Curated annotation (Swiss-Prot):
Organism: Mesorhizobium japonicum (strain LMG 29417 / CECT 9101 / MAFF 303099)
Molecular function GO labels: phosphoribosylanthranilate isomerase activity
Gene3D superfamilies: Aldolase class I
Enzyme class: isomerase
Protein name (record): N-(5'-phosphoribosyl)anthranilate isomerase
Gene Ontology BP, a term: L-tryptophan biosynthetic process
Pfam family, one: PRAI
HAMAP family: PRAI
Record pathway: Amino-acid biosynthesis; L-tryptophan biosynthesis; L-tryptophan from chorismate: step 3/5
Organism superkingdom: Bacteria
Reactions mediated catalytically: N-(5-phospho-beta-D-ribosyl)anthranilate = 1-(2-carboxyphenylamino)-1-deoxy-D-ribulose 5-phosphate
Entry keyword set: Amino-acid biosynthesis, Aromatic amino acid biosynthesis, Isomerase, Tryptophan biosynthesis
Length: 219
């Protein structure tokens, strides 16, 4: 099974080059002002040019207004929207129709009962991103470097397309792939030398760890 890999929170040409060079299927740009990974729409539009024909460029937003989304879509020309806030199913459907783009809906998980939150979005969201619930007091809905118990995904309905996120890094990606067997993975803080600072060497290390883990499973 092919594994989609998204490097999220990109802000520099060097990080983009490392992500694409490693074989990222998706590259993500954060449009949430409180995040250290925030990037201006015009700059994201410049950066995403390197990904054309190589990777899916994802615009990550958090309860964004229509006006801000219009600016993002115009300046960046994303291939996909990722909604990482409290957007309800009707809002997801509205934005899909407004922009004609596929939507990935992020949902925070911590226990098996949280899987019930997926059902209202089935048939509306094109894909899900499962992240850990933010630590108490955190202003960031994602990118907190926190993992959840991946074993709860065993209760997921067959056919649900998703990316696994939350606290992934080179040290634990093998366990994550073994326990959850996800169709896709998303990493942000796990390839940073400081909050918001992507490290090309850590990106390369992560891709090596993914390849090693997949080789071990295939052996």
């Amino acid at each position: 099974m092919a594994l989609d890999i998204k490097i999220c929170g990109l802000k520099t040409d060097q990080a983009m080059a490392a992500a694409l060079g490693g074989g990222a299927s998706h590259v993500g740009f954060i449009f949430f002002a409180k995040s250290p990974r925030y990037v201006e729409p015009a700059e994201a539009g410049r950066l995403r040019e390197a990904a054309r024909g190589k990777a899916v460029a994802v615009a990550v937003t958090v309860d964004a207004t229509d006006a801000f989304l219009d600016e993002i879509v115009s300046a960046m020309q994303p291939d996909m929207l990722q909604l990482h806030g409290s957007e309800h199913p009707e809002r997801v459907a509205e934005l899909k129709a407004r922009y004609g783009l596929p939507v990935m809906k992020a949902l925070p998980l911590s226990e098996a009962a949280d899987l019930d939150r997926i059902r209202p979005f089935i048939g509306i969201a094109d894909r899900f991103l499962f992240d850990a619930k933010p630590p108490k007091g955190s202003e960031l809905p994602g990118g907190n470097g926190v993992a959840f118990d991946w074993r709860i995904l065993a209760g997921l309905d067959a056919g649900v397309d998703y990316m696994l996120s939350g606290g992934l890094n080179a040290a634990n990606i093998g366990d994550a792939l073994r326990l959850a067997n996800p169709p896709g993975i998303d990493i942000s803080s796990g390839v940073e030398s400081a909050p918001g600072v992507k490290d090309p060497a850590l990106i390369e290390q992560f891709f090596r760890a993914v390849r090693a883990a997949r080789d071990d499973r295939a052996a």
